[in-house]
Amino acid sequence: MLTLSDLQSLCHEAAGRISPHVRHTPVEYSHALSEVSGAEVYLKLENLQATGSFKIRGATNALLSLEAGATGVVAASSGNHGMAVAHAARVAGLYPLIFVPEGAATSKVEAIEALG
């Protein structure tokens, strides 16, 4: 069974692994949300990442954790996940193959192509 200490260790390892490859985004206090909720609300501005979302963190950690010898990665997405996998594959030195649904917005397809 995974203990809290084990989980903390795994999180610290992941943070160290991805740190050179992701932006260190700010945390900002939200007066409006704090007032509405009656609690102190802080926002982690992951929209400032290279891919525009937090998904770059998980994708980068996963691809940098692959066993030696991996040469590529496959994903299916027309959005943030596809962009994150394409970016992380480039960081990890892997070939990304991202399947995008027919009819996906051209801007999203171009963003994925630009990243990987």
Language-model features, listed with the residues they occupy:
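PLP-dependent amino-acid enzyme catalytic core
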Residues: 1-116
